[in-house]
Regions:
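Rossmann-like dinucleotide-binding core of oxidoreductases
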Residues: 127-134, 138-164
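Short helix-capping segments at alpha-helix termini
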Residues: 26-28, 53-60, 160
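Residues at the starts of beta-strands that form the adenosine-phosphate
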Residues: 3, 32, 62, 164
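Gly/Ser/Thr-rich loops at beta-strand to alpha-helix junctions
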Residues: 9-14, 40-42, 144-152
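A structured beta-alpha segment of the ubiquitous adenosine-cofactor-binding alpha/beta core
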Residues: 54-78, 84-87, 105-115, 119-122, ...
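N-terminal Rossmann-like dinucleotide-binding module
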Residues: 4-33
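A short, gly/pro- and small-residue-rich
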Residues: 92-109
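NAD(P)-binding Rossmann-fold cofactor-contacting core
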Residues: 27-51
């Protein structure tokens, strides 16, 4: 049985869709799914949604939810990261500040000045997560779904080239 840790599991759409897709693979149907988020309310919503997917699909998978990142990561075989490092209200400034200075931003969280703003806020959090991965599940495969994806993946590769 594989253990898959979802860090930032409160991202309802991503988590629900990824779990649903993951469970279509026979080798993953008995997985232990460890949901982790710092927002207790959102974590509760996602836990109920994932429990429903498991129940309705009659999968033998197990699901836990925690606000403790170490608990979720311990002995994980895979780590899926879908975090938002700051409240969504902060994200608005990534669009409005460049706009005020007439800097065109075609995609507000992946490229241009806006993407750099978000990357600078998110990199320290991502690197902390990867430090924990190295400590608690060093053989895990890490899948990042957090934007700006390319900047964050590059930072992780430079800091931790041995993480998969």
């Amino acid at each position: 049985m594989a253990k898959v840790a979802f860090i930032g599991a409160g991202s309802f759409g991503f988590t629900r869709g990824l779990v649903r897709d993951m469970l279509t693979y026979p080798t993953m149907q008995d997985a232990h799914i460890a949901l982790m988020d710092i927002d207790k309310e959102r974590l509760g919503y996602v836990k109920r949604a994932v429990d429903r997917i498991v129940h309705e699909g009659s999968y033998p998978a197990t699901v836990t939810a925690t606000q403790n990142r170490v608990e979720a990561l311990r002995d994980a075989d895979a780590v899926i990261i879908t975090i938002l490092a700051q409240p969504i209200e902060v994200w608005r400034h990534d669009i409005e500040i460049p706009k005020r200075f007439k800097v065109d931003t075609n995609v507000g969280d992946t490229r241009s000045v806006s993407g750099v703003f978000r990357a600078l806020r998110t990199m320290p959090v991502m690197l902390d997560i990867i430090r924990d991965v190295k400590r608690y599940c060093p053989r895990a495969i890490v899948l990042n779904y957090t934007n700006p994806m390319s900047m964050l993946c590059r930072a992780m590769q430079r800091q931790f080239p041995d993480v998969q």
